[in-house]
Swiss-Prot record:
Disruption phenotype: Guca1a and Guca1b double knockout mice show an increase in response to light in dark-adapted cone photoreceptors. Dark-adapted cone photoreceptors show a delayed response time and a delayed recovery time in response to light. Guca1a, Guca1b and Rcvrn triple knockout mice show rod photoreceptors have a reduced current decay during light response. It comes from Mus musculus (Mouse). It is found in: Cell membrane; Photoreceptor inner segment; Cell projection, Cilium, Photoreceptor outer segment. The lineage of its organism: Eukaryota, Metazoa, Chordata, Craniata, Vertebrata. It is a lipid-anchor. The keyword Metal-binding applies. This is Guanylyl cyclase-activating protein 2. Gene3D superfamilies: EF-hand.
Length: 201
């Protein structure tokens, strides 16, 4: 009890090692000598200029990464966010995803907030058509149908809003809900492509 993990155990658990952290820092300093990353730079790194759907998704990601709400991402916020997205536990990813959906930061997700993100994710996934085809052989639901079904399965008190507890428990309880939410938790094809194209990553 209370023992610290060795580097090998930390790596096995999916945590970053010092060499990886140093590499990320070097890239961050080269791209952001001021020590902060602004929205327009964040979009540039993800190659979303001129792509409205991707831009909307990346703006939501930026707001979730910007923990202190100062409209910039510093190195610690950047590392924490990327480590979470790429390696975090399911519960941590769900909490982070909830923040992306909760645009007005009122602690609940309404239908419009959920629909906005689901629509953006659907459009992003079209860039990874092979992934969509593999995931959704057969009938593909519309974003509106996805939102209706999620609310039917997850909104336990029927108030038209999803609390963090409803969001997490609903995802854990229902495999379909989890799969739909994982479209945001881990947009694997898209985020991997963007990381490879970007000098930042």
């Amino acid at each position: 009890m209370g023992q610290q993990l060795s580097w090998e155990e930390a790596e096995a658990a999916g945590e970053m090692d010092v060499a990886e952290l140093q590499e990320w820092y070097k890239k961050f300093v080269v791209e952001c000598p001021s020590g902060t990353l602004f929205m327009h730079e964040f979009k540039r790194f993800f190659k979303v200029t001129g792509n409205e759907e991707a831009s909307q998704y990346v703006e939501s990601m930026f707001r979730a990464f910007d923990k202190n709400g100062d409209n910039t991402i510093d190195f610690l916020e950047y590392v924490a966010a990327l480590n979470l997205v790429l390696r975090g536990s399911l519960e941590h990813k769900l909490k982070w995803t909830f923040k992306i959906y909760d645009k007005d930061r009122n602690g609940c997700i309404d239908r419009l907030e959920l629909l906005d993100i689901v629509e953006a994710i659907y459009k992003l996934k079209k860039a990874c058509r092979a992934e969509l085809d593999l995931e959704h052989q057969g009938q593909l639901l519309t974003p509106e149908e996805v939102v209706d079904r999620i609310f039917l399965l997850v909104d336990e008190n029927g108030d038209g809003q999803l609390s963090l507890t409803e969001f997490i428990e609903g995802a854990r309880r229902d495999k379909w809900v989890m799969k739909m939410l994982q479209m945001d938790i881990n947009p694997g094809c898209w985020i991997t492509q963007q990381r490879r194209r970007s000098a930042m990553f």
